[in-house]
Amino acid sequence: MSDVKGKSTSGRGLTPKQEKFCQLYIELGNASEAYRQSYDCSKMTTEVINVKASELLNKNGKITVRVEELRQAHQQRHNLTLDNIIADLQEYRDICMGRKPLTITTVVKNAQEGTAQSVNTECFVFEPTGANKALELLGKHLGMFTNKVDVTTDGKPLPTVINVTFSDEPA
């Protein structure tokens, strides 16, 4: 995979350490920890590690491309898409709010005849905690619960006003 100089021969132009960083970043989701496990950080402070990991992740185009490739492969491998997650949350919300029936399967065994039969029963459930969580996650996805404070007027910052009063009367 790599030659004597430590350059990748995989066609991506990444060194083995850079490739390891990319793999660990996808696995761990933490750039600093991926950097610690990929490079010698014995003489570095936590702040230096954080800066170097951030620079490696954000300023190196080859690493950015590789991380995106790995992320897409990871999503395909786990069949995770935003649409699937949202659809599942909506279905969960509907079940928890009693809009959609929940199917419960019960196995009825007959010991004398030696048979087992499954019986499906549909019921409506109201689970407010689950419905609340599903609605909260859907709302967060839509950006409904962000705390934004607009401190501008017509795109300009508000002027700072300081009122000072002087009085000759003793307090």
Swiss-Prot record:
Per its UniProt record, what InterPro entries does this chain match?
Terminase_Gp1_N_sf, Terminase_ssu
| Matching Pfam families | Terminase_2
Q: Provide one Gene Ontology biological process annotation.
A: chromosome organization
What is the protein named? Uncharacterized protein HI_1411
Q: Which organism is it from?
A: Haemophilus influenzae (strain ATCC 51907 / DSM 11121 / KW20 / Rd)
